[in-house]
A protein has these predicted regions:
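Acidic donor-binding loop of glycosyltransferase active sites
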Residues: 288-304, 314-317
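Conserved acidic donor-binding segment of nucleotide-sugar-dependent glycosyltransferases
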Residues: 333-334, 338-345, 352-360
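Donor nucleotide-sugar binding/catalytic pocket of nucleotide-sugar-dependent glycosyltransferases
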Residues: 168-208
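Membrane-proximal helix-turn-helix segments that form the acceptor-binding/catalytic region
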Residues: 101-102, 122, 153-173
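Nucleotide-activated donor-binding/catalytic signature segment of Leloir-type glycosyltransferases, i.e.
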Residues: 265-288
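Conserved donor-binding/catalytic core segment of Leloir-type glycosyltransferases
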Residues: 215-234, 240-244, 255
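A charged, aromatic-enriched C-terminal amphipathic alpha-helix characteristic of glycosyltransferases
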Residues: 361-389
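An aromatic- and histidine-rich active-site surface loop
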Residues: 96-97, 111-138, 143, 304
């Protein structure tokens, strides 16, 4: 039996102007899993949209994509292993391109939306030769600051080089960053560039989670939270330094740095008021961390687009961010947090203390209002359907 029988004859009649679309998700790594699932779950079985998911060992997509869409989905399981990463690096292929082409032919797909990034030039050419349009979501046009072991750094360099090459070949692009939208439009006036809002990262598993991270059982003071994958560009060392230099913060609070990744901090020299939860944080643990935090800090050195504020705003956690343009736009519009001068340790310390001493009731209301109005899944779906059907 063909693998495509998983679609279970989910073909539906198309309107005259409808373009049958296949959304391809190539990774659930880091925040990409919730990003994809929250967008995909806005669709219904009645929409002329199909789905191809590359799942890892944890079956993230199979667990988080709503059941009613499974009959129109293919879940291709391939381990996120070192050998598979090496193959992808050497061959410049995801390893399932032929399967995507098969489903496009069998179900007469007219547009493929690569929701995690740009497909290879070879894959773009193959799809175009079959009369299929390609829409690619551009996430990070330029690489962020990074401090990685040599082979990961090399992989990042190669990946961005290929991304630039793939970008030159692409015709239809979409991004979730207004600044990036403007830059893409300026650099590539011959291409069609679209924008839609970044989705909320609050999945049902996150919203309904009740699990307490075991490490927090030993916390005996209110805590300041950083949560996210550990990356150099997120400014974690800046936050660590700002906290450690303040006697007031050390006397009254703990700093919790939670997330998987390479810390690049000498944890042996950290004082007892700093707790590193340096592991993968399960979705069921996130609600507790945010609900019980005195505040959350996002000290990013750079940020193109991010969904982290959706977590803070959903749980109404007092928020402090750097004033990089992406955060500044949301904080100024929502009044849902405070900002500090990017890279300024002293200002970061002062703003943390100010946030912890202020009445945050209005801030929390602003967060709730902004979340309700701006993390609107129906609006994202409507925008994408317009793009798919050439109405924008």
């Amino acid at each position: 039996m063909s693998i495509w029988k998983s679609f279970q004859n989910g073909i539906i009649d198309r309107g005259r102007n409808m373009k049958r679309t296949l959304i391809v998700a190539t990774t659930s790594y880091a925040g990409m899993g919730p990003y994809v699932s929250e967008i995909v779950n806005t669709f219904s079985p009645e929409d002329d949209v199909y789905f191809f998911f590359h799942d890892y060992e944890d079956d993230f997509f199979k667990r988080n994509i709503k059941k009613e869409l499974h009959k129109k989905s293919v879940f291709f399981k391939q381990a996120n292993s070192a050998i598979n990463k090496l193959k992808e690096l050497l061959l410049n292929s995801e390893g399932y391109d032929s399967l995507i082409l098969d489903v496009c032919r069998e179900f007469q797909i007219q547009m493929v939306h690569y929701i995690n990034g740009l497909p290879s030039i070879k894959m773009q050419r193959c799809l175009e030769q079959n009369g299929i349009n390609i829409l690619s979501t551009v996430h990070d046009l330029s690489p962020h600051e990074a401090k990685k072991v040599w082979y990961k750094q090399f992989r990042q360099i190669v990946s961005y080089k290929r991304m630039k090459e793939n970008l030159l070949a692409a015709n239809l692009l979409v991004t979730n960053s207004q600044n990036q939208y403007e830059e893409l439009s300026r650099r590539f006036p011959e291409k069609k560039v679209y924008f839609h809002d970044f989705p909320s990262l609050v999945t049902s598993e996150i919203a309904n989670g009740t699990k307490i991270p075991v490490e927090l059982n030993h916390i005996n003071k209110p805590y300041i939270l950083f949560f996210g994958r550990i990356e150099e560009y997120k400014g974690i060392r800046l936050l660590f330094t700002a906290f450690c230099k303040s006697q007031e913060l050390n006397n009254n609070y703990n700093l919790v740095i939670a997330g998987n990744g390479q810390l690049n901090i000498d944890t042996q020299k950290a004082n007892s008021n700093v707790l590193f939860i340096n592991r993968y944080i399960h979705d069921e643990e996130i609600a507790y961390m945010y609900k019980h935090a005195a505040c959350v800090v996002y000290p990013y050195i750079s940020a193109t687009q991010s969904g982290v504020l959706s977590l803070a705003f959903y749980f109404k956690t007092p928020t402090l961010t750097s004033n990089v343009s992406f955060f500044r736009k949301i904080i100024e519009e929502s009044q849902g947090g405070l900002m500090f001068e990017n890279g300024d340790v002293d200002d970061l310390t002062e703003k943390i203390i100010a946030l912890l001493h202020m009445d945050v009731s209005k801030m929390k209301q602003n967060q709730a209002d902004y979340y309700r109005l701006n993390y609107n899944p129906q609006a994202i779906k409507n925008t994408l359907m317009d793009i798919y059907n050439n109405r924008k």
